[in-house]
């Protein structure tokens, strides 16, 4: 073992990456109290450009990134990344840990803590900088093929709060309603939908469509998620628009005056009829019940355990 085999997270630069989140100043103060050495990158347009700016702000080759809506657990900064006996790819990989979503209780990478290397971030081309003809990176960093060094990890170290305002909650739902309907960034046909969209995405999409009435602005998130799926799968709307946050403002102006529950119910009937998606908005009490039991058997296994490792164990691959 050499000195580079184990990295203390506390020795890494920590970048708080914010844009237009309504709670970003409050969260920045909390992050600075928790992580006094934290730095901030704010209001950089475009996800790829913002991450590149975060990489440039870091003085350490590997760094920790906190999204603007995310509040980490303080214990995260006491952990170590132990690369002893790990494949060399672990040292090169980017890690996306899970976050608990405050709206619906989901635990996955959306909004979660992440760790990047300056070299990788400087050379990646995602979102607004994706390569011509490559749609896999339109709305996410998830990548396949030989360059797959962006890894979904199993452990959960934070909670994301994308529901501070009606617009923020609606946008969060809409974005996920679009992303989870796609097949590696491409829009499937209606007939292909259930075959090409992974079962895990469908499970999470269904939860976005139905859970969250127990929290402030949760119904706006449900409406947004249903609308995102509807516009992606059943209209001619260009789903590539999802990558630019400015586009949401214009779209929001068309929907801000509407009643979210009434609209979500109407869209739900169409999604059930055309895509055979389960539509059942849970009451606040039912949502609380679901979230309590959904997270009951979730526990951390180690910061370098990948999500795929656990899935293989569970499914006996």
Model-based region annotation:
Residues 1-33, 317:
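N-proximal low-complexity "stem/linker" segments adjacent to membrane-targeting elements
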Residues 10-16, 36-39, 63, 89-96:
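Hydrophobic beta-strand segments of well-ordered beta-sheets in folded domains
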Residues 19-23, 70-73, 102-104, 120-123:
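Short acidic, S/G/P-rich loop/turn micro-motifs used as interaction or catalytic elements
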Residues 51-52, 74-86:
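Short alpha-helix within the catalytic core of nucleotide-sugar-dependent glycosyltransferases
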Residues 61-74:
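Short beta-strand-to-loop acidic/aromatic patch adjacent to the donor-nucleotide binding site
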């Amino acid at each position: 073992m050499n000195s580079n085999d184990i990295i203390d997270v506390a020795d890494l630069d920590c970048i708080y990456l914010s844009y237009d989140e309504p709670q970003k100043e409050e969260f920045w103060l909390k992050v600075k109290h928790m992580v006094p050495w934290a730095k901030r990158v704010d209001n950089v347009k475009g996800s790829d450009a913002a991450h590149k700016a975060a990489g440039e702000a870091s003085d350490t080759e590997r760094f920790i990134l906190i999204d603007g809506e995310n509040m980490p657990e303080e214990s995260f900064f006491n952990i170590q990344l132990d690369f002893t006996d790990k494949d060399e790819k672990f040292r090169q990989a980017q890690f996306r840990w899970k976050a608990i979503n405050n709206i619906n209780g989901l635990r996955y990478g959306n909004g979660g803590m992440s760790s990047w290397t300056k070299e990788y971030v400087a050379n990646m081309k995602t979102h607004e900088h994706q390569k011509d003809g490559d749609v896999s990176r339109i709305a996410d960093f998830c990548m396949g093929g030989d360059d797959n060094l962006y890894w979904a990890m199993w452990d959960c170290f934070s909670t994301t709060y994308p529901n501070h305002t009606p617009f923020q909650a609606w946008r969060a739902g809409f974005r996920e309603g679009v992303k989870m309907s796609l097949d590696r960034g491409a829009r499937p046909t209606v007939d292909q939908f259930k075959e090409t969209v992974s079962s895990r995405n469908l499970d999470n999409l269904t939860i976005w469509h139905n859970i969250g009435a127990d929290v402030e602005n949760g119904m706006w998130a449900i409406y947004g998620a249903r609308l995102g799926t509807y516009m992606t799968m059943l209209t001619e709307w260009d789903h590539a628009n999802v990558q630019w946050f400015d586009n949401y403002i214009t779209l929001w102006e068309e929907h801000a005056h509407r009643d979210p529950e009434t609209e979500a119910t109407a869209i739900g009937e169409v999604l059930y009829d055309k895509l055979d998606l389960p539509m059942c908005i849970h009451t606040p009490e039912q949502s609380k019940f679901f979230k309590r039991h959904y997270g009951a058997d979730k526990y951390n296994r180690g910061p370098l355990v990948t999500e795929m490792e656990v899935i293989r164990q569970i499914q006996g691959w």
